[in-house]
């Protein structure tokens, strides 16, 4: 099945592959159905009563464990630590593989495509956009976690925490951009 992902294929080659391989088509359809289900579920929850529940559990005095803000920040940290840092970089490089520290290049994202770094950079950029309240289809800085940090006066040393985080993310993107693909 890996022949489908090789980067020299055209769009038509990909369509032909899925249309002529029942298992691949089933997998693709299942992925699309899953994305559609969860997108609609989240939209329904946020346009329903969950938005009010989230807000009522998110006052500046209520950032303790179990609060909406705490859960949001912990989820963001998990995403960065486990999905991006560990999953996309650390495991393939052997940094998180127990005592062996064995390099496992086959664990990189898009192994057969031979380009995984653009996906690492895009993941980090998406995280930055999320923090700064930037929609996936806009470059406008809307209300985000950065505004909450400013509202509660979150600081590291004498710098605003949101500025420190954004600077660190920019540095991560710069450093990842200095790596060479393929990581595999």
Residue ranges and their predicted role:
Residues 10-86, 90:
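A surface/extracellular/periplasmic glyco- and lipid-processing/surface-interacting theme
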Residues 18-28, 40, 45, 51-53, ...:
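An amphipathic alpha-helical core segment
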Residues 1-6:
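Short, small-residue-biased leader/transition segments that mark boundaries at the very start
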Residues 54-158:
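Flexible, glycine-rich surface segments
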